[in-house]
Amino acid sequence: MNVNHPSLSFEVFPPNTAAGTANIKETLDRLQALNPNFISVTCSNNKSNIEETTLKLAGYINNTLKVPAIAHLPAAYLNTQQVTRILTELDSLHIHQLLALRGDIIPEVPRKDDFKYASDLIRFVHAQKPGFKISGACYPEIHPESPDLVSDIRYLKQKVDAGCNQLITQLFFDNDRFFTFKENCALAGIKVPIIAGIMPITNRKQALRLIKTTSAHLPKKFLAIFDKYEHDPASLRTAGLAYAVDQIVDLITRGAAGIHLYTMNHAETAINIQNTIGSLFNSSAQLNN
């Protein structure tokens, strides 16, 4: 990876309505024009239906739009037979990249027993398809279920040792915490690229949900934007986008390997960021299909 030209990538999720399906194709057409390094596709809430949701959308991205696609696989909801079938399907779609996760634990969705942790899934995929590029998730501010920082970094090292080629962070809003995390990874011998996951906050509903549910630290500057513009949608959008742009520029300047935008299936914010600071990124995909 050329550190002077870090990657730019996007995350989308499979829609569950007809209107959502129409919207996602329009969104993806617009994201394609930004020449991302890759687009990742999350799992739907019905995690047993990955072939009809995640893989179908990833196939469209990879083969129709000609943008490298990464499919999310949740370890907790898959068994070895399913993963073997999914890997075969990915091969047929010419997709040789995936993001291995444990997956959020949803009480109403039955878990499987084959892969307790993401590292178990990574190890299995690496053995079955050693040519696949495997991404893993990481938490700059510690996984909510980890007992402490040392344990969290140790578990992350296990993912990398199992065959993980790069890491993508959960969203965060305090860059200093990201770089402290990056230093801790280096001290632990974690040498794979760490891509920063960024979610621009551009509307009141999104901000309120984030404030209530996130474990990420919200800096005073971020909270001040919401306090001042909570009931002014246009100004909140402008200020939220400016915050994200400042965050991204700082990350790139200080050596982040790449930026992964959580788009929420909307292209406007990504387009605005590309128009503002697009020259800081690679102009074409670096990850090989």
Residue ranges and their predicted role:
Residues 7-23, 69-81, 135-151, 228-242:
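Active-site mouth loops of central-metabolism enzymes
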Residues 11, 39, 90, 159, ...:
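Conserved, mostly hydrophobic/aromatic
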Residues 23, 75-89, 112-117:
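Glycine-rich anion/phosphate-binding loops
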Residues 35-57, 104-113, 164-178, 264-267:
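Glycine-rich, proline-tolerant flexible connector loops at the mouths of alpha/beta enzymes
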